[in-house]
C-alpha cells in the first residue's frame, strides 16, 4: 500500500476515469505519442556513422594494432612487406591494396572500396577476411561482395559484373556473396574483396600496396612503432590500425556537432509538445482533483492518484510513440550516407541503440508527469477543496494577469540570456536555442492578451457574433488555448531555425562548388561522388581531346585525399593556366589576386581555416607538409574556408603536386570549348573521343554542379530530416490538440446554444478562434525561429568551417507557417461543425 491506497485501487480508479473520459485520454495520449515519436525520430536521424564503420574496419584489421600506410593512392613497393615481417617485435604483417572502384550490374552501379588481401590477413582474425578471402571460392580470379552490394547491383555468385577502376573497365566474376549471418552489419558496407595479386592487376598497380597491417608481439607495440617509423624514412605514415575510425571521427565531427545541436533542439521541442498535449487536460484534471478532495482523499493521496494515472498514460503513449518514431526512421528518414563512401568504408545501415529508445521513453513519461503536476497548487492547505468547482464557468483553467506578466518578463529575459550566452561563448548555442524555445511558450499568454485588446476594439466597428465569442475566449487565456498555440509555435520555431540554417549552409556550399567547377566547360573524370580525387591512366587522351572540333584547351587537374595528422584533407592541384585557383567566396584571409599569383608559382599553398588554426598559421608563414616524397616546406598563400570538406583542404599547383607526389596521373581533364560552342554539343564531342576509354565520364559544368549540390544535400540530410520531422509532428500534434480542445468545450458550446447562438455562429467562432490562436502562436514561433536561425547560422560557420551566409528566406518561413496553420484549420473544419451541433442538454448534464 502507498499512503493507505492499494495498487489495485489505483488501477481501478484509473479504469473508472478512463471509461468516463475515454476520448480525452486518447487525444492526450496521441499528442504524447507524437511528441515521443519526434524525440526518437530526431535522435535516430542523428545516429553517428561510426557505429557501422567501426564494425567494417574491425572486420578487416582483426587483431592488428599498427599500420604502415602510403601517403598517396599509388601506394608503395610490396617488397617492403618482407622487411616489416623481419622486424624483431612483429608477430604478423599483412599487406593490403585499397582502391576506389565502381561495380556495375543488371540493376545498377555502386561505388565501393576494392580491397586486395592475402591469406596472411586471415591470421589477424578479421570477420570480413575470415569469411570472404579465406575460403576456396576466391582461389583464382574474382571478387567477393557483401550482400548489400550484391543486391544493389543484382548479382549472385558466379555472375559477371563490370568493374571500373584506374580509368579502365574490366569484366570480373563474383566468387562469393557474404551475408549478415557471417559478417554482421558489414554485409551492408560498400566493399569488394579480392586476392592481392588480382587486385593489383585490376587497378594497374603491379607490385604495389597501400598499407600493411601489423600485429606486434605482446608488449612490443611501442618498439614496433619506432621500428616502422625508421623503415618509413619519412615517406610513409605509421598509425594505429584503426586509424580510419580516428579520421572518420574528425570528418564527422562538424556534421555530428551540428546535427547533435539541432537534434537536441528537435528533441526538446518534442518533449515540450508532449508536455503541451498533457496541458490540454489540465482543466478537467483540476476538477478531478477537487472531486477527490471532496470524497475525503487527502492531498498526498490525490497527488498519488493523479501521478499514477499520468505515469500509466505516459508509459502507454510513449510505447506507441516509439513505434511511430521507429517506423518514420526506417521509411521516410532512413539515412544513406554514400557521400562518404569514396573516402571511408561507410555503409547505409542505421545503428539503433537501446539507449536512444529508453531516452525517448523517459522523455515521454517525464513530460507527462510534469504536466500532471500543474494543478498541484490546488492541493495547498489554504485553498478550499472545492475552489475550482466554484470558479466562474467551473473550468479553473484561465491564466491570470499576474502570471501572464511573469511569463512575459521571463520570455524577454530568456531571449536576452540566449543572446548573451551565444556572444560570450558560441559553444553555448545549444543552451541558447533551448532558451529561445522556452521563451516562445512564455510569450504566448501576453500575445493573447494583446490580441484580445486589439480584436475587442475591432469588434466595435465589425459586428460579428463569431468575433465576440473568439475575443471572449482569448481574454480568458485558457490553458488549452495556450497549449494549442504552443504546439504550433514550437514546431515553427524549430523548423524555421533548423531549416533556415541548413538553407544557409547549402547556399554557401553551392557557391563554393560553382566557383570550384567554373574553370572548365566540360569535365572528364571517373564519375562518382569522389570530389574529383580518383586518378586514372588514359595515355594520349589529352592530345586527342585537344584536337577535337570545338575544343579550345585541355588541362590536367590533379587531386586526392591525403592523411595529415588527424585529418583526411582534400588536396586540390590546379594548373597555372586555370582562370581562377582560389574560390573567391571562400577566401577568409589574404588577397585573392595575390594568392592566385603565388599559387601559379612553386612552394605556395592555400590552406583551410581548420588546418591553419590547428597549426597556428598566418598568411605568408611557412609550414611542413608530409608528402609521398618526404616532408616538404610550403608557405601560406591564403586562408580559406574548409571548401565543403570538413577536415579542410590544401590548394596548390599541379607542378608542385607532380614533383612531390611523384605522379602525372590526372584526376580530371578540364576541357574548355571555343566561344559559341554549346556545352551539350561540346559534351557530345568529348564523349565521341572517350569511346576508347569506357571507364571515363564526360559532364558539363552544369551537370557536375548538380552532382556536387546533390552530395551537399545528402551530407546535410539529417538537418533536413529533423526540420521535416518537426513539421510532421506539428501537423499531427495540432490535429490532436484541436480535437481535444473541441471535445472539452462541448458543454460550453451547449450553454451558448441556450443563450441563442445557432450552430453556424458557433462553427464560425471556432474557426475564427482557431485561426487567431494558431496565427499568433505560429507568428511568435516564426519570429523567434528567425532569431534562432541567425544564431544557428553563425554557430554552423564557426563549427564546420564552411561559408553559411545568412538569408532571411521569408517565403520559406511563410510556407512553414501556412502549412501548420492550414492543417489546423482543415482539421478543425469538420470536427468543429460536428461539435457545433451539440445538443443544449449537454450543458445541463455537465
Language-model-detected regions and their locations in the chain:
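Alpha-helical transmembrane segments, especially those used as permease/efflux helices
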Residues: 1-8, 12-31, 254-257, 318, ...
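Hydrophobic, regular-secondary-structure patches
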Residues: 25-113, 136-137, 151, 159, ...
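Peri-transmembrane interface segments
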Residues: 52-53, 230-268, 281-283, 292, ...
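Short beta-strand boundary microenvironments
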Residues: 112-152, 511, 531, 539-619, ...
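Small-residue-rich transmembrane alpha-helices
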Residues: 275-278, 312-343, 355-381, 410-422, ...
